[in-house]
Amino acid sequence: MPNLLIQGGQPLNGTIRPHGNKNAALPTLCASLLTDELVVLDNIPHITDVEKLVSYFKDMGSKVYWDKGAKRIELSHRDFGKAGNAALPVGMRSSVLLFAPLLHRIGQVPLAVNAKGCALGVRELDPHIEIMHHFGAEMIQSASAIDLKIAKPMQGCRHWADYMSVTATENFVMAAVLAKGNSILLNAASEPHVQDVCRFLVQLGAKISGIGTSRIEIEGVDSLSSGAFQISSDFHEVVTFLALGAMTDGHVEVHDVQTEHFDLIIRSFAKLGVSVENDGETLSVFPGQTRVIQKPLTSNILPKIEAAPWPYFPVDLLPLMIALSVRAQGEVQFWNKVYENGFSWIPELTKFGAHVVTSDPHRIVVFGNRPLRPATVEAPYIIRAAVALYMVAATIEGESRVIHADPIRRAHPGFVENLQRLGAVVHWD
């Protein structure tokens, strides 16, 4: 795997336009299978999982034109299924998002139970299979595979999810929009990328209400039409560059931001002593900030940032705020309420000299503003943890190395090039 070689200590200055959110792009691409008509998607990031989906569509007979420079994909699935077999793309966890589209199109989903994604913790197939069962699918299981099959059109249903799963919510929505009758999902995920998928389907003629809430109601339609849609900017990338600007005492502006999603995120920056200026569609940080962690009014209570399903603080952003806190003055607790392995990378962070105490698998305390030193660290297969390790290294004078940093490429195309434009001295080794 590629490594990042970093000469730290330079302030980052300049402007950034984030790429499209991969967590919106991938399910939207899968949802395009729900229509035979032309679909045009803009602001598609050039990442490996998109490449795998595009290859899969082509292998199955779809017509796909991808203008990588313009970040646009045009798709026509009228001939999908006339070539190849429906085996899901390997090496990408988002292949579960093909469950509903494939059941609608060809009536079956052959699934090898070894999908790979981040190393954050156990993520079940059961919620997806349970949802498909509610819509009428049958599961056939062997020692190494699970087949989902459906013999007749899906029927609308009411489902109360065990927890707010992003991908399970997206699968429910994709199943329901073409199911007969009405469907209701309770305890639905409401992240910005889930909202993107719903709005894309509405653009094609789906009837969805409750977008952005925990209760989604859908009236099934007979078919979906053609349409065009622009993927929202990646809020993970927005936070990454704002935090880097603050950590290196630089001036960074991030444009094309859906700032209506950032109220809680901006307050979380403020907890760590960083002021973020909101100017409509632009967020900025400026040099000269004190970066002192805010103490609660209640004495003897640690300040904390809790991550949980939206509209809580997004769990994927937690590593970035941990990195930021390492360079802040004071102590702060981080609580990951979602993944049991979300802090497995912390021992690598301490190699820089960071002082972090692990309370339990879901909680840590960072004691900030300790002397740091260059180091060679190993990134886990967790995208934002790899980014966080780079962020800390970028603030330390001298040469550091983040080995096995390739997970960054799963979400952040041109990451190193963007850093270099801002003044960072970093390259793939």
Each PLM stretch: what is its role?
Residues 1-429:
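Short, structured segments at the rim of ligand-binding sites
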